[in-house]
């Protein structure tokens, strides 16, 4: 049963203080029972509202990120593959690379969990309040190519330069056209200038990326800065994917 004045409820709705509204009855009951003093009552309501706003903001950031799946380190099975550098990956979860404005490169064979780890890292960034974005490299390049065609390139590339951290998944999958190489150069240069990290996942080792660019000058200018200032993690071993397939049984 509600013990709250309807006029107060309406005022909280008008002020968009739904966090306070949702917990007001419980906080009033705590106060009447002597569990909270008057100042503690106000502080509790304030914390309830802050928690509600932070939760709503995180939900919005995760929606804008366009993840393939909501992946976190808590649901990643580090024991599935003894070859994974677990200590190095957990160190990345501390986000010191983010504070330093440094990028991360996760490379290795298909199915070892590179995309999961990348998304888990930016999920942690989002929980800390940063805007993040996930993109398949090929789809991003196709999107930017469309911008050249309809003269919306500047608007489209801002979607990838604006977030604090950008994941480029499946980087260096195939040879790039000159236009794709130029677009990557502009994107990576812009993010480097503003100190916004990238997280790249790739099936190729970074030293094998250079030959995928038609212009070696562009390749060296783009990749040297990126590779030499990034944390490079080799993720090797058996595929992680069979363990995630529905209906799989273990012996």
Swiss-Prot record:
Pfam families: IstB_IS21
GO molecular function, one term: ATP hydrolysis activity
Binding site for ATP: 108-115
Keywords: ATP-binding, Nucleotide-binding, Transposable element
Entries under SMART domains matching the protein: AAA
GO biological process, one term: DNA replication
GO cellular component terms attached to this protein's record: plasma membrane
Record has ATP-binding as a keyword: yes
InterPro entries in the cross-refs: AAA+_ATPase, DNAC/IstB-like, IstB, IstB_ATP-bd, P-loop_NTPase
Extra facts: Was identified as a high-confidence drug target.
Family of this protein: Belongs to the IS21/IS1162 putative ATP-binding protein family.
Full protein name: Putative ATP-binding protein Rv3427c in insertion sequence
Lineage: Bacteria, Bacillati, Actinomycetota, Actinomycetes, Mycobacteriales
